């Protein structure tokens, strides 16, 4: 009560402790209080102000990631799914496609294209998504299917599977780049969508985390290839292991240089 009276009385926050100011920020943050904090020279108070500015900047960044979703809602669509795939480029392992329906304008700190995030941040956001999403689904396309139908078709098939397996069903779908011409749900294909849409970013994170976990398990079975580190991508160490040991069961036999290795046998 005393603190509130003091704040109301000409914003005399210099009489308040750092803890009291933090508590007040939670209870009644307003322009007058922010101005008083900005003008308080104490280092601790300035730290509070800078932290608040960072949080507001992050909240605005995340809010901007819902531009496509809110555009869909303005046209009457309620359940908007984001879809993305991970693993088209590696020489080994599956393609993983994920689809995610997030609550409307749900704030997830640091959400972004999974490639721009550290492993620890991806894991943290993954847990938030799995706990709070309206729906999550994923499709895993193994290396044998990739070799049989080609990587582009495999990824496309995975997207259809991930979308149609959602429960509840989406009203609209936001897709990272790939056109899905046969999809009978309203959809938009967005170039670099995982950096422009929160729903697509969430899907990219789910797909990335789950594929990385799979490659970590494959590393235990085939330790010579370093899958836990390279995730199946063609690093110099991985290529050297291929030359030394040849391909293993999860290598994509239709990808070079593995295709040539198999043909030479």
Please provide the spans of the model-predicted regions:
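Short, small-residue-biased leader/transition segments that mark boundaries at the very start
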Residues: 1-7
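RNase H-like, Mg2+-dependent phosphodiesterase core
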Residues: 8-81, 88-265
């Amino acid at each position: 009560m005393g603190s509130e009276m003091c704040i109301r009385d000409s914003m005399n926050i210099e009489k308040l402790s750092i803890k009291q100011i933090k508590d007040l920020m939670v209870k009644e943050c307003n322009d007058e209080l922010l101005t008083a904090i900005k003008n308080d020279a104490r280092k601790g108070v300035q730290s509070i102000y800078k932290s608040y500015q960072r949080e507001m900047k992050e909240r605005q960044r995340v809010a901007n990631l819902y531009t496509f979703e809110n555009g869909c809602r303005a046209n009457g669509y309620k359940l908007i799914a984001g879809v993305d795939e991970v693993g088209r480029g590696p020489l080994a392992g599956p393609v993983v496609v994920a689809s995610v329906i997030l609550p409307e304008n749900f704030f997830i700190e640091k959400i972004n294209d999974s490639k721009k995030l550290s492993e620890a941040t991806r894991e943290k956001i993954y847990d938030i998504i799995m706990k709070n999403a309206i729906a999550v689904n994923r499709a895993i396309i193994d290396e044998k299917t990739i070799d049989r139908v080609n990587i582009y078709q495999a990824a496309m098939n995975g997207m259809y599977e991930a979308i149609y397996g959602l429960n509840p069903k989406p009203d609209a779908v936001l897709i990272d780049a790939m056109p899905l011409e046969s999809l009978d749900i309203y959809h938009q294909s967005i170039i670099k969508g995982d950096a422009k849409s929160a729903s697509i970013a969430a899907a990219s994170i789910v797909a990335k985390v789950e594929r990385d976990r799979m490659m970590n398990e494959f590393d235990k079975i085939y330790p010579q290839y370093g899958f836990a580190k390279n995730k199946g991508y063609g690093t110099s160490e991985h290529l050297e292991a291929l030359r030394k040991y040849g391909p293993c069961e999860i290598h994509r036999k239709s990808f070079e240089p593995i295709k040539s290795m198999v043909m030479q046998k």
